[in-house]
Amino acid sequence: MKIYEIVPVALGKKMPDVLIKNVNLVNVFTGKIEKTNIALYKKRIAGIGDDYKVGKEVIDAKGLFAIPGLIDAHVHIESSMLSPTEFAKLILPFGTTTIIADPHEIANVLGVEGIEYMIKSTEGIPLNVYFAIPSAVPATNLETSGATLGAEDMVSLVEKYPFRIIALGEVMNYPGVLDCDRDLITKIEILRHKYKKIDGHAPGLTGKELNAYIDAFVRSDHECETKEEALEKLSKGMQIFIREGTAARNLNALLPAVNEMNHFFFSFCTDDRDPNDIIERGHINGIIKSAIDSGIDPIIAIRMATINTAKYFNLRSMGAISPGYKADIVFIDNLKDFNIKFVIKDSKIVVEDKRINMNVESIIRNIPNTLGKINIVKNYSLSIKNRNRKIRVISVKSGTLLTDELIVEPNVEKGYVVSDIDRDIIKIAVFDRHKASGYSIGFVHGLSIKNGAVATTIGHDSHNLTVVGTNDEDMNYAISRIKELNGGIVVVKNKKLIASLSLPIAGLMSDKNYGFVVEELRKLKNSLVEIGVNSDILMQIHFLQLAVIPKLKITDKGLIDVEKQKIVDLFVEV
């Protein structure tokens, strides 16, 4: 659209394509609510005011409140287990019209091919999808990934997709920043000199180390767990993305840090949410509603989901309902209940009565093959000989990705260390599924599995094959079924398959519609009850490999002391 086309519409000399009348417009600039009309032309807002009376199409909002299209500041589409187009279909009815996606999950499996698949498969759909190019593929040198993304790859991608790539993805390797790792610093320098944002990931970082991290032009963080952590990072110039995902939920802990003076430096993100969680709790709209219910002023909550994020990422025509801005508008009943009535995207009604009323298909349909599919070592054993020492155990906690390290006496049978169901300590193994280079074995506490096993090819960030279980027989059977699926999730009991979900796209995403995935995932979660689990542990299992979030994790190379960034032995020296 040309400027000379829209100016006559704003002046009333040319009829708008769409006139929306009787609107209670939430103005994120003034913080006020205005009873007015909105004139739309092509994909833009031409003007706002009572002077606009006619349009080629007229929509009577009947007093509904109009807010800007919602923005997710940081999300991994792959965590939904849906293809990008199916993810769009799922979140659009919840009012999200823009996301900043970090495709480092598929990048760790497929490299550049995976990133290009995500970019191309989101072209031409009614969702603004921008990308933060992954900064760490692999995330650390303590795991085996399916690909490596170097500085030259980044230059090529940014030059090829200059308007789609708007940031460097979360810099998880903060020890690499502090050690001035040449490759990582080069990537940061390349992106910042192309005027892209540098997104952060620095759980618990404080003091001089935080200063040094920010010196590397890192300007955001979504890993804050406490009010104090958020306020320190904010005081040093960081944009705080308040995360409310499936496994990691930080909203309640961080809202006390938000006030009338500083709220412009807070945004909302989901990071990682599975589709069932989105259906049950909504998307960014659900976070806004929870914030309002917790006492946050509705205007402030809306700003945190719109204009704050747009300004941080320099999305200059998004995040507000204003002349010249994109015509992405969400209509809700009121500012308390926050029920979405319809959604306009690019001047077209795309959602009405919670249903998408237009085709949501990308311009490409080619799905990349998984590299090597599920390629693990042929001869392996899950047995662990006792060494007459205490063992390290990963301890998971609900509502956080942080883990603890337990030092305990092992449960020994016939000279081998085995699971201890009474103490909720079970065996875990991680296999390199990309190059069949090896595997490691450990123990995890807090999953509550009583009898059976769970195996999955989702394992942040290199996404190697993880299997947890109470006995080796079920674990071995789960591994065999995962190989047959060529990736996915399986639940096994007494060497019988209880439930499964096939994820053929890189072992991370389904090629089926979101309704199918939601139903299969529901069956999968219900099946966990049969092995003794009363809560959803899948997302917790999926993060047990993440060697950049403290304290103790496990990769295909062994147990990882995250704070020291080194491999540690299962058995503890006394």
UniProtKB/Swiss-Prot annotation:
The name this protein goes by in its record: Adenine deaminase
Cited Pfam families: Adenine_deam_C, Amidohydro_1
Disulfide partners: none
EC code(s) of this entry: 3.5.4.2
Enzyme class at the top of the EC tree: hydrolase
The reaction(s) this protein catalyses: adenine + H2O + H(+) = hypoxanthine + NH4(+)
Cofactor(s) of this protein: Mn(2+)
Keywords assigned: Hydrolase, Manganese
Superkingdom of the source species: Bacteria
GO molecular function terms listed in the Swiss-Prot or TrEMBL record: adenine deaminase activity
Biological process terms in GO annotation: adenine catabolic process
Signal peptide: none
CDD domains (alphabetical): AdeC
Family: Belongs to the metallo-dependent hydrolases superfamily. Adenine deaminase family.
